[in-house]
Amino acid sequence: MLNKLSRLLEQAGISLTDHQKNQLVAYVDMLNKWNKAYNLTSVRDPNEMLIRHILDSIVVAPHLRGERFIDVGTGPGLPGIPLSIVRPECHFTLLDSLGKRVRFLRQVQHELKLENIEPVQSRVEAFPSEPPFDGVISRAFASLNDMVSWCKHLPAQDGRFYALKGLVPDDEIAQLPEGYSVESIAKLQVPQLEGERHLVVIKPNHF
């Protein structure tokens, strides 16, 4: 699996250390093992996990600005765990309301010795925002409108929302709450992944 990951990274033009590659493979191994009992993801094939979970997450890294991020509705740690591995200088709070997912995240944190993550079991509306975050990240969490409405207390004044989407969600963009606008839309290149992937970056208009 390490060779497969190395080929995918090369195709994506991403350079990682051997330690980072080993951490990503170890995470996939854990996800595959726990998935059999806890049903954490619908992807059953570890090689598919490399494409649809690992690469699909880390291609976002160059677009993130800041040092403190929160991954809302992280599930089994996506995209937060892969991002924390490739951006070790940043801190990621991983938020999910389901206990089984957070237990898995804590086990990953322990086994991979990830000191820059904090798994938290909470609903996003109930989670305090002190201190505020540089970025709020979501992948398959909610519509843009719901994401901004539920998470508006989390980012700093000049913070951003980062939403991973498939096709550009024009209908969701049109329904953004007042006071927010799209700063950029980046087409993400994920090797061997069928379908389009985009990162929508949303900013508050006061900044």
From Swiss-Prot:
Q: Provide the E.C. number(s) assigned to this enzyme.
A: 2.1.1.170
HAMAP family, per database record: 16SrRNA_methyltr_G (MF_00074)
Residues that coordinate or bind S-adenosyl-L-methionine: G73, L78, V124, E125, R139
Keyword Plastid attributed: no
Which CDD domains did the record assign?
Answer: AdoMet_MTases (cd02440)
Keyword set includes Transferase: yes
Name recorded for this polypeptide: Ribosomal RNA small subunit methyltransferase G
**Domain of life assignment:** Bacteria
- State the SUPFAM superfamilies in the record: S-adenosyl-L-methionine-dependent methyltransferases
A single GO CC term for this protein reads:
cytosol
Q: Which Pfam families does this entry report, sorted A to Z?
A: GidB
Kindly report the protein's main subcellular placement as a broad class: cytoplasm
Entry similarity comment: Belongs to the methyltransferase superfamily. RNA methyltransferase RsmG family.
Gene3D superfamilies assigned: Vaccinia Virus protein VP39 (3.40.50.150)
Q: What does this protein do?
A: Specifically methylates the N7 position of guanine in position 527 of 16S rRNA.
